[in-house]
Design a protein with these regions (language model features):
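N-terminal small-domain helix-loop-helix segment of the aminotransferase-like
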Residues: 2-6, 11-103, 110, 289-292, ...
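PLP-dependent enzyme catalytic core of the Aspartate aminotransferase-like
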Residues: 87, 162-163, 344-346, 354-363, ...
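Conserved PLP-anchoring active-site segment centered on the Schiff-base-forming lysine
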Residues: 114-136
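A short helix-loop-beta submotif of the ANL/AMP-binding
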Residues: 138-144
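Active-site phosphate-binding strand-loop segment of PLP-dependent enzymes
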Residues: 144, 149-220
Length: 404
C-alpha cells in the first residue's frame, strides 16, 4: 500500500509547546498519573473564569450567530476594536483595516501566508513565541532570529537586529509584552526598532496579546502608535485578559499608510474570504469585553492572583542554587536560566522530559522558543501559590542528579 508522509512544507516547522514532551505527559495522564501542566497559558485550567457579562453576551447572542458573518468579522466587534486602537493611539485604522480571527494564532499564519515568497526573511525575536517562526517557515520564508538580551531585562539587542538585515528582509516581529520572558519594552527601545524599520522599509508585526496584563504600575505602548508613517500589523485578543482562550477571539489591525501594500492587503482579503469567517458567536463578546469593566486589573495589583503568583515564582526560582530569572513585568510566564557551570545539562528537552517523568510537572524547554542554548525553560505562573510551591521543592531535588 502506498505510504503518505507529511508535506515537505512542514520540514522546518516546529511547535514544541505542544511537542514530544506533551505527548509523554498525555500518555502519563492516560495511565492515571496526575500532571501539573505548566506548558501553556490557559487560564481556565487554573480556576480563572470569564467575566459574567461576557458569558451573558454569549448566551444572548446565540440565535444571532447561526449564520456566517462578514469574512473580516461583525461590525460591532470591529467598531469596538477600532475604538480600542484609538485609546492605544494606533493611527489610521478604519473598520476595513480590522480582521477577526479564531485567536491570534489563526491570524499570524494568515499574515505570513499572504506576505512571503520562498526565501523571504522575517526578523523574529530570540526567544520567541514559536508560532511566529513556524508560520514564517510554513509560508516558505526564513525566520532570522535577533537576540533579546537577558542581561538587559530581555530587551531586544538593537545592534544585533541591524546586523541581521539583508536584501531579503521583509518584516520584523515584535512580541511586547514578551512571551516567554515577560519583558515589557520601554518606548526608547520601541523607537529604535521603528527607526530600523523605517530605514529598511520593513513591515512591523506587533504581537501584543498581553498588553492588558501589565504589572508594577508599568504602561504598555503599542509600537504602531510610535510609527504613524509606517505600515504596521498589530495582533491582539481576549484569550488571556478575559480568560476565554477556548472562545478563540483574536484580531489583526492594519495601521499607517497603505498605498504601497495594496497587493498584500488584497492577499489578506483573499485568505480571509477563503476561511469564510471566524467564530461568530465569540465575536459578539468583543464589544462588551473591550468597553466594560476590566476585571483583569484586579488580578494584576498587589493581592491579586497573577501578581502574587508572579512574585512567588520569581523568588522561588531565584532561591534555588544555580537557577536565576529576570522578574516578569507582564504576561503569565517566567523564563529561568540554568547555570551549566553548576549543572550538567546539555539537552534541555531531555531535561524537562526527565523532570516530567520524575516529578510529574510539565514545562517547556528553552529551545522550544528558539533560544540558542540548552539552558532555559519556561514556567507558567497561573497555578495557585500552593501548587507553584511544588516547583521549588521538586526542582531543587531534581537538579541534584545534574550537579557537576
Amino acid at each position: 500500500m502506498k505510504e503518505y508522509n507529511k508535506s515537505s512544507k512542514l520540514e522546518h516547522v516546529a511547535y514544541d509547546i505542544r511537542g514530544p514532551v506533551l505527548e509523554e505527559a498525555m500518555r502519563m495522564r492516560a495511565n492515571g498519573e496526575k500532571i501539573l501542566r505548566l506548558n501553556t497559558g490557559n487560564p481556565a485550567e487554573f480556576g480563572f473564569t470569564a467575566p459574567d457579562e461576557v458569558i451573558h453576551d454569549l448566551i444572548m447572542n446565540a440565535r444571532d450567530s447561526e449564520g456566517y458573518s462578514d469574512s473580516k468579522g461583525i461590525f460591532s466587534a470591529r467598531k469596538a476594536i477600532m475604538q480600542y486602537c484609538q485609546l492605544k493611539k494606533i493611527p489610521n485604522v478604519d473598520i476595513d483595516d480590522i480582521y477577526l480571527g479564531n485567536g491570534v494564532s489563526d491570524l499570524i499564519v494568515m499574515s505570513m501566508q499572504g506576505l512571503l515568497d520562498n526565501g523571504d526573511e522575517v526578523l523574529v525575536p530570540m526567544p520567541d513565541y514559536p508560532l511566529w517562526t513556524a508560520a514564517v517557515s510554513l509560508a516558505g520564508g526564513n525566520a532570522v532570529h535577533y537576540l533579546c538580551d537577558e542581561e538587559a531585562n530581555w530587551y531586544p539587542d538593537i545592534e544585533d537586529i541591524k546586523s541581521k538585515i539583508t536584501s531579503n528582509t521583509k518584516a520584523i516581529v515584535v512580541i511586547n509584552p514578551n512571551n516567554p520572558t515577560g519583558a515589557l519594552y520601554p518606548d526608547e527601545i520601541l523607537l529604535e526598532i521603528v527607526e530600523i524599520a523605517r530605514q529598511n522599509n520593513l513591515i512591523i508585526f506587533a504581537d501584543e496579546i498581553y498588553d492588558r496584563l501589565v504589572m508594577d504600575g508599568e504602561k504598555h505602548t503599542a509600537i504602531a502608535s510610535l510609527a504613524p508613517d509606517l505600515f504596521c500589523v498589530s495582533m491582539n485578543g481576549l484569550s488571556k485578559s478575559h480568560r476565554i482562550a477556548g472562545f478563540r477571539v483574536g484580531w489583526m489591525v492594519l495601521s499607517g499608510p497603505k498605498h504601497h501594500v495594496k497587493g498584500y492587503i488584497e492577499g489578506l482579503n483573499m485568505l480571509s474570504n477563503m476561511r469564510l469567517c471566524s467564530n461568530v458567536l465569540s465575536q459578539h463578546v468583543v464589544q462588551t469585553s473591550l468597553g466594560g469593566y476590566q476585571s483583569v486589573d484586579e488580578l494584576l495589583l498587589p493581592g491579586g492572583r497573577i501578581y502574587e503568583q508572579r512574585n512567588f515564582i520569581y523568588k522561588a526560582i531565584n532561591d534555588i542554587p544555580g537557577l536565576s530569572a529576570v522578574k516578569p513585568k507582564a504576561g503569565l510566564y517566567i523564563f529561568p536560566k540554568i547555570d551549566r557551570d553548576m549543572y550538567r545539562v546539555d539537552d534541555d528537552e531531555q531535561f524537562v522530559l526527565e523532570f516530567l517523568k520524575q516529578e510529574k510537572i510539565l514545562l517547556v524547554h528553552g529551545r522550544g522558543f528558539n533560544w540558542k542554548d540548552p539552558d532555559h525553560f519556561r514556567i507558567v505562573y497561573l497555578p495557585r501559590v500552593d501548587e507553584l510551591a511544588q516547583i521549588q521543592e521538586k526542582m531543587t531535588r531534581f537538579l541534584k542528579q545534574y550537579k557537576r
